[in-house]
Amino acid sequence: MTILKWALIFFVVSVIVGVLGFTGISAASADVARILFYIFLVIFLVLLILGLTIFRA
């Protein structure tokens, strides 16, 4: 019974993702993810440089 339950859960998830993937929602979320990636990359690089220079113990 649990295998059938998991198969049904994955079917529902795949249908939802398929519906969202064939609309404009995926493109919008990809743009948001790209912007967040670059923001966190800049924050990481700033903290890395500060950690190697100013905040060295």
Curated annotation (Swiss-Prot):
It is found in: Cell membrane. Keywords: Cell membrane, Membrane, Transmembrane, Transmembrane helix. This is UPF0391 membrane protein RPC_2356. Signal peptide: none annotated. It comes from Rhodopseudomonas palustris (strain BisB18). The chain crosses the membrane at residues 6-26, 35-55. Its main location: membrane. It comes from the Bacteria. It is a multi-pass membrane protein. Belongs to the UPF0391 family. The keyword Lipid metabolism does not apply. GO terms for cellular component: plasma membrane.
